[in-house]
């Protein structure tokens, strides 16, 4: 036996004797700076609290030009909305995806500053904003009276947490010819959603490509449906 090899053979045992297993919990409040530009269309000369529609734009409207967030949105079709409502459209920074923590905190801040009916907050968004819509609805289902996603990418986190959507009034819109975000995103998500939320609706526009937002937001029935819903306290 070569004795000079003994220390190497004993090394793993030595390391095990010097290791310790630590079980603990991190419980600390971390402060972070939150910054997000937005447009708020708030009705004039209204008495009492008003409903709030939150709109999350797609990737093409990111950046620092706030006028872009009005494109392809409920802003375009305000004349179809038959009662006074506030419309909130934040802007996602360039080269980013939606930070739903910041969006949530922005909504809470708007509630503090303006007369918003907490039982009538509605969430919608298209493409990247549709993803943000589903993500925020998953994280805070207690906030929204109705949710409408349009041509939204979906992910495994959403389907793994599908129970979060079970009590929401929801519509999923998608173009049947969409070659940017394939319709399979909507189909697969709805297959998971329907068993836990049978009232949720999947709406496919068979001839629409990625621009299914036009068919969605130009339909006055969308706003009638949204505004008919109230969040139970």
Model-predicted regions and their roles:
Residues 1-21:
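Bacterial Sec-dependent N-terminal signal peptides
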Residues 113, 119-164:
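Primarily recognizes the serine-hydrolase "nucleophile elbow" in alpha/beta-hydrolase
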Residues 17-52, 85, 131, 136, ...:
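A domain-start/cap signature at the N-terminus of enzymes
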Residues 52, 56-102:
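Active-site machinery of serine-nucleophile hydrolases
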């Amino acid at each position: 036996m070569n004795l000079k090899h003994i220390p190497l053979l004993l090394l793993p045992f030595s390391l095990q004797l010097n290791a310790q297993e630590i079980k603990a919990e991190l419980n600390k409040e971390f402060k972070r700076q939150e910054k997000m530009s937005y447009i708020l269309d708030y009705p004039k000369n209204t008495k009492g609290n008003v409903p709030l529609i939150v709109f999350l734009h797609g990737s093409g409207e990111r950046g620092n030009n706030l006028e872009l967030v009005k494109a392809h949105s409920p802003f375009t079709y305000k004349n179809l909305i038959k009662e006074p409502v506030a419309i909130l459209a934040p802007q996602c920074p360039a080269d980013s995806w939606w930070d739903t923590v910041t969006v949530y905190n922005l909504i809470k801040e708007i509630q503090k500053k303006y007369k918003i009916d907490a039982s009538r907050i509605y969430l919608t968004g298209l493409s990247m904003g549709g993803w943000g819509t589903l993500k925020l609805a998953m994280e805070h289902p207690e906030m929204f009276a109705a949710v409408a996603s349009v041509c939204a990418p979906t992910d495994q986190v959403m389907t793994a947490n599908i129970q979060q959507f079970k009590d929401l009034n929801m519509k999923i819109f998608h173009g049947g010819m969409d070659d940017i975000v394939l319709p399979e995103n909507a189909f697969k998500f709805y297959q998971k959603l329907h068993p836990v939320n049978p009232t949720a609706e999947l709406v496919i526009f068979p001839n629409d490509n990625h621009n299914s937002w036009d068919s969605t937001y130009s339909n006055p029935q969308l706003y009638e449906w949204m505004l008919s819903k109230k969040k139970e306290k």
